[in-house]
C-alpha cells in the first residue's frame, strides 16, 4: 500500500460518529474528548465494546469510598498521578499509585477510593450501567450513566 493510500485510509477513519452509528471503525482522540469535559469526576463515554464502556474523566481531590459488587473496574492513567486506596482487598488494606501509561484493575467487591493531588486524566473501562459512586451510594458526584461526548 502506498503512503498516500495509507494516509487516505487514516483520514477516512479519523472521524466522530454518534453512538447510534455503532458498527463503524473509527479513530477516537482521547485528548480531544477529555478537553470537552469542564469539571472533575464527570466520566463521559467515548466508545463501547460489547457491554463495556470506555469513559474519559478528569479527577482531582478525593472521591468517596465505594465498591462495585458485580463488576471489576479498570483505571488507565493518561496524564498525572492517581492513588487508589483500598479497604479489605485481596491483599488487605493499602494503596497503589498509577502514573501516566499505567493501569490497574480493581476487583469486584473491593472498597476503593481514587485520590489525586493534582488533576489526572484517565480512561475507565467498566460495564454499561455501572454507577460511578458504586452500589447504593449517591452524592453530588454521582453522574447519570451513558453520557456520551
What feature does the model see in each segment?
Residues 1-55, 139-149:
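A short, N-terminal "cap"/entry segment at the start of jelly-roll beta-barrel domains
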Residues 39-40, 53-69:
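Conserved short histidine dyad/triad with adjacent acidic residue
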Residues 50, 78-79, 99-100, 118:
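A cytosolic small-molecule/anion-sensing beta-strand core signal
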Residues 56, 95-97, 113:
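Well-ordered beta-strand positions in beta-sheet-rich domains
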Residues 58-59, 68-88, 125:
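Short, conserved beta-strand element in jelly-roll/cupin
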Residues 68-70, 98, 116-118:
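Short glycine/proline-enriched turns and hinge-like loops at secondary-structure junctions
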Residues 88-108:
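Short acidic-glycine-tyrosine-enriched beta hairpin
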Residues 108-138:
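Ligand-binding loop in jelly-roll beta-barrel domains
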Amino acid at each position: 500500500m502506498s503512503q498516500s493510500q495509507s494516509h487516505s485510509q487514516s483520514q477516512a477513519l479519523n472521524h466522530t460518529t454518534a453512538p447510534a452509528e455503532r458498527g463503524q471503525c473509527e479513530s477516537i482522540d482521547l485528548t480531544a474528548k477529555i478537553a470537552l469535559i469542564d469539571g472533575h469526576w464527570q466520566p463521559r463515554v467515548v466508545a463501547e465494546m460489547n457491554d463495556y464502556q470506555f469513559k474519559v474523566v478528569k479527577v482531582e481531590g478525593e472521591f468517596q469510598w465505594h465498591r462495585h459488587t458485580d463488576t471489576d473496574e479498570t483505571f488507565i492513567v493518561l496524564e498525572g498521578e492517581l492513588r487508589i486506596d483500598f479497604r479489605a482487598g485481596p491483599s488487605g488494606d493499602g494503596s497503589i499509585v498509577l502514573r501516566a501509561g499505567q493501569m490497574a484493575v480493581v476487583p469486584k467487591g473491593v472498597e476503593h477510593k481514587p485520590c489525586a493531588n493534582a488533576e489526572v486524566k484517565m480512561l475507565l473501562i467498566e460495564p454499561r450501567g455501572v454507577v460511578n459512586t458504586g452500589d447504593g451510594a449517591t452524592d453530588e458526584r454521582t453522574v447519570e450513566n451513558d453520557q456520551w461526548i
